[in-house]
């Protein structure tokens, strides 16, 4: 064994291993204290890139879930207001049916109409005041809104809200009134029993309806018979004995053509009708009350269709949230496997590094004493 004092190779070797053990000890302590296996790019460059992408996706999913919940909140707010609007329309329908009864006097019908007008005002108030985050939902100004329900661009759904004001054209339709009044003694002539209705629906479907009325039916029986043949429009009789037809707004596009011998007998003409909405309802007369029922039925159908659409959107958003939550769970699990510290493994590494550090320190101390052997040779 060579003994020298200029170069202590043993000490240098011990110091190298001590430095390595200390570095590993520091790394283990950093990982255990931070909880992250990757604390800088030098720990795992590829793993850092992957974990950062997964972090961005997870954060995006978290925001998307909040966005979806906001969409549900808007839908719930609008649907709750529409529920109250439905209750108002149901009450107005009750009033119209009550007013159509022949036992009511003019003053009684006027009282019923006053309540109906007050309900129309409340219908408008609900439409104008229902809002979410400062945006009006049911007065027609909301239009459509896009809800970002994904962690990447383009992952959105569109929710639209329309007006449910009493004067909205979709809350009604068109009315057609015969020119010739008929008394109770009148009956459908055997030579003029045919009625033909031709019109186009909003969805583009062409409708041709041929009706052969019953010979001898009076005007009220005729209205009942027509209603039994179709649900696309409603027939009723006003206080003067005139047949009136009401067509809900979604069921007609353009002219409503009426022809046939019975149409001529009644003076029932087609063409563009008189547009009527819930705002135009007047139940101070039998005819107005009868027509009001058709208008309100059309309005109820319209509001119900809007509520159904909102319900479908809520269900879609709820399923979207469940899916986003599942994706986020798996993304976080993947990120954890890449970036998080395995405490069992790292604790073992810490113990190993501590032992090696202690051993290295002890060996280095002994190695530093080796040059002293040269002094003993000089004595």
Swiss-Prot record:
Q: Which residues form a coiled coil?
A: 104-129, 314-341
**Under the GO molecular function aspect, what terms does this record hold?**
structural molecule activity
Q: Which Pfam families match?
A: Flagellin_C, Flagellin_IN, Flagellin_N
**Which InterPro entries does the record match to this protein?**
Flagellin, Flagellin_C, Flagellin_C_sub2, Flagellin_hook_IN_motif, Flagellin_N
The entry's localization annotation reads: Secreted; Bacterial flagellum
Q: Would you identify the family this protein belongs to, as annotated?
A: Belongs to the bacterial flagellin family.
**PANTHER family given in the database record:** FLAGELLIN
Q: What is the name listed in the Swiss-Prot or TrEMBL entry for this protein?
A: Flagellin A
């Amino acid at each position: 064994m060579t003994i020298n004092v200029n170069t202590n190779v043993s000490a240098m070797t011990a110091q190298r291993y001590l430095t390595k053990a200390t570095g590993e000890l520091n790394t283990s302590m950093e990982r255990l204290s931070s909880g992250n296996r990757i604390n800088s790019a030098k720990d795992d460059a590829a793993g850092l890139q992957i974990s950062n992408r997964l972090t961005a996706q997870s954060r995006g999913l978290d925001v998307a879930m909040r966005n979806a919940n906001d969409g549900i909140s808007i839908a719930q707010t609008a649907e709750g207001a529409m529920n109250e609007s439905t209750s108002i329309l149901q009450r107005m329908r009750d009033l119209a049916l009550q007013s159509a009864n022949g036992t009511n006097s003019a003053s009684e019908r006027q009282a019923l109409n006053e309540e109906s007008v007050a309900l129309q005002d409340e219908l408008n108030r609900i439409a104008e005041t229902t809002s979410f985050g400062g945006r009006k939902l049911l007065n027609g100004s909301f239009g459509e809104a896009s809800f970002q329900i994904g962690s990447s661009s383009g992952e959105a759904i569109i929710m639209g809200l329309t007006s449910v004001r009493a004067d909205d054209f979709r809350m009604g339709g068109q009315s057609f009134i015969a020119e010739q009044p008929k008394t109770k003694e009148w009956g459908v002539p055997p030579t003029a029993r045919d009625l033909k209705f031709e019109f186009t629906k909003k969805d583009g479907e062409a409708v041709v309806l041929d009706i052969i009325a019953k010979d001898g039916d009076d005007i009220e029986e005729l209205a009942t018979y027509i209603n039994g043949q179709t649900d696309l429009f409603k027939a009723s009789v006003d206080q003067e004995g005139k047949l009136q037809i009401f067509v809900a707004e979604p069921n007609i596009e353009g002219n409503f053509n009426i022809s046939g011998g019975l149409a001529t007998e009644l003076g029932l003409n087609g063409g563009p009708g008189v547009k009527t909405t819930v705002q135009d309802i007047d139940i101070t007369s039998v005819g107005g009350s009868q027509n009001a029922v058709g208008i309100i039925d059309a309005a109820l159908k319209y509001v119900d269709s809007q509520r159904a659409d909102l319900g479908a959107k809520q269900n879609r958003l709820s399923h979207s949230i469940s899916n986003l939550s599942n994706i986020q769970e798996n993304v976080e699990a993947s990120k954890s496997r890449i970036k998080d510290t395995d405490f069992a493994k790292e604790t073992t590494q810490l113990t190993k590094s501590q032992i090696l550090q202690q051993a290295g320190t002890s060996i280095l101390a002994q190695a530093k004493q080796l040059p002293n052997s040269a002094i003993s040779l000089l004595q």
